[in-house]
Swiss-Prot record:
Its EC number is 2.9.1.1. Pathway: Aminoacyl-tRNA biosynthesis; selenocysteinyl-tRNA(Sec) biosynthesis; selenocysteinyl-tRNA(Sec) from L-seryl-tRNA(Sec) (bacterial route): step 1/1. Transmembrane segments: none annotated. GO terms for molecular function: L-seryl-tRNA(Sec) selenium transferase activity. Its cofactor is pyridoxal 5'-phosphate. Belongs to the SelA family. Homodecamer; pentamer of dimers. Binds only one seryl-tRNA(Sec) per dimer. It is found in: Cytoplasm. This is L-seryl-tRNA(Sec) selenium transferase. One of its GO terms (biological process) is selenocysteine incorporation. It comes from the Bacteria. Converts seryl-tRNA(Sec) to selenocysteinyl-tRNA(Sec) required for selenoprotein biosynthesis.
Amino acid sequence: MTTETRSLYSQLPAIDRLLRDSSFLSLRDTYGHTRVVELLRQMLDEAREVIRGSQTLPAWCENWAQEVDARLTKEAQSALRPVINLTGTVLHTNLGRALQAEAAVEAVAQAMRSPVTLEYDLDDAGRGHRDRALAQLLCRITGAEDACIVNNNAAAVLLMLAATASGKEVVVSRGELVEIGGAFRIPDVMRQAGCTLHEVGTTNRTHANDYRQAVNENTALLMKVHTSNYSIQGFTKAIDESELVALGKELDVPVVTDLGSGSLVDLSQYGLPKEPMPQELIAAGVSLVSFSGDKLLGGPQAGIIVGKKEMIARLQSHPLKRALRADKMTLAALEATLRLYLHPEALSEKLPTLRLLTRSAEVIQIQAQRLQAPLAAHYGAEFAVQVMPCLSQIGSGSLPVDRLPSAALTFTPHDGRGSHLESLAARWRELPVPVIGRIYDGRLWLDLRCLEDEQRFLEMLLK
C-alpha cells in the first residue's frame, strides 16, 4: 500500500464520530439510528472501493451528512409517485389510467380509517354480500337484473367463462380474438377457463349463419368481444348484439359480451366519439356484459359484470369469485364513482376523466399561449419554445382510431441535437413531481390536455 493510499484511507471517518455530529441528529430522528448506521457502513465500503480503484476519494466525502440525506430522501420516495401527465394520452395505462373523483378519494380514506359494513347486514346483524350495494347501483344505471364485481376486466372475462362455459364450446368471431396489453389474449383466457374456442367467420367478415353453423350440443355461449383497442375498416361485416341475441334465443344459447372500456354515458353528447354502453347491450337481451372500472367509466381498477340474475348467481357461487373479488377500497371508490352517474348534469365537472376528455382545443390553446412566454424566457437560450396543435388520444385501448384536437408546448433544440431533448426530458423526470412528455419529430412535446395545476407546473419548470 502506498503512502498516498494510506493517507486516503486515514481520511475516512469513524461512524461513531459522524453520529456525534449535530447534522446527523435530524437524520437519525427522521430515518432511525439503525438505517443511518447501515447506510454509513455501505458508504464506507463504497469509499474504500473507490480508493482501491482510482486512488481518490468520492466527491461526497466532503459532506457525509448531505450525501446521507440525499440518499435517504430518495430511498423514502414512494414507488407510486405523482406525476404530471403531458403525454397526450388521457387514460395512460403506465400512469395509472383514470384519475379518481374527489368523492371516490374521500370514500377510500373513510373505508381505510374505520371498520365498514363490507359483508355485514345492519338490518338483521347477519352476514351480507360485499357486492350487494354496488349491484343495486349498477342495476339502476344499466337496467340489468344483477351485477358482480371483481378486481379487473380480465378477471371478469375469466370468471364469466369459467362459471358458465367450462368444459364446453364458446363461439367467437375470428375478427374479435383480441389481445390487450400484457399478452392477454381471448384464446388463452378461454383455455384457462376450461373452454374450447370455436372460431367463426373471417378476420374482416362474420355473418349470422357462421354462428348458426357453429352451434352444436356442446355449445355453451355465443360471445361478442368489443375490439376497443383496434379497428377493422373497409370490406367488413359483423352482426350486432341484438341480432346475435335473436339467434341465441332461437338456438337456446345465451350471449355474453366483453365490452372492455365500458362507458356508462353516451359520449357523443359531449362531442366525443360514441362507444357502446352496457345498458344498450342489456336492453338488447345480452345475458352477461363485462367492462372495466378504470377506463371510460372513470373509477378504480375493477371488473364489472352485469346481466341476468341466474347467470350472475353462477358467477357469485364459483370458487374463482373469492380469488378475484374486489377489496373494500376498490368497492368504496367504485360506489362513490357510480353515484356520480345518478346526477348526469354534473358528471363532466365532477368526474376527472370526463372533464379532461371534454376540454376544448380552444381552451387548451389559450392555456398553451399563456405558458409559452415564461417558459421561452427560461429555456430560450437552448430551445425554441412554441405552441403547436396536436392530437390527444383516449388511451387504455379505448376508441383506438379517434383523436382529440389539443395543443402542446414544444421544445426544439437550437443545435438540432436529439441528445439535448433526451437530457431535458430526463431532467424533468427528476423533478419533485416528474413532468412526463414525449419526444417526437425532433421536438419534446407537452400536450396540455391533462394539465390543470398551472402554478405547480410553472414553479417546477422555472427552477
